[in-house]
């Protein structure tokens, strides 16, 4: 069947955001940064953004860039921290509660480990929104709204594309244990192409990812497609295919400048875009609008920022924005 993404909610949300703006005239060490906006006056608000970022993963640069721009546009202070260990991420959320921030934006990558602490924030009167990971759990957590891509839908689209291209067997790599979003991606692939095998890799070690994929390709010659769940792993797969001397095509979720260039060069067939810049921007803007006006973007429904597919037919339009760190 043909997969279509319904984007009306997201379009309406962004349109509402534009109107509001006009009216307003992680497997690694914890990471913490702070920035103060100055472009939209001084709102006096301090917001915390807490994620499961793995150190060195440039995907999160776009999340942060969007969040920092929203803080600048609203004159708010943004405190960013991250840890890929869910238990430690929960501690960071508790730290934000203890510091009495005006709002919290967080990912829900491992819901069972994070929801109890998120509920503490809500109970303390701190508004929380969520983004990126945990679309099926945000209401349970008490989040106002969730900004994310539909990961299962993206996986289905990837499976469809590989199938149409003549896939015989797909290898789907998962780079973080326990991530509900990553698991949904591979489930979506398998839903459309049952002969899909998942492999767990260490997303914090590119050399190990390359080695694991190369070993699998050498062991199983029936694999002729790889779907990776992150841009860095997509580039690792390119190396693995070359080293294995295999005839294998690659598609990936997410992007960075090198992966986008690889799509243009034909080394990667496509990347699935969830617009991380937009996730970061909307997450901070929602907290500001909620504090100022009681606004809830999307009426509390999940607001989709993806999935959309970028391949050779449209990479020329998207690549400049990827290089500018805004897409």
Give the location of each predicted region.
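Extracytoplasmic "Venus flytrap"
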Residues: 41-70, 74, 78-90, 108-111, ...
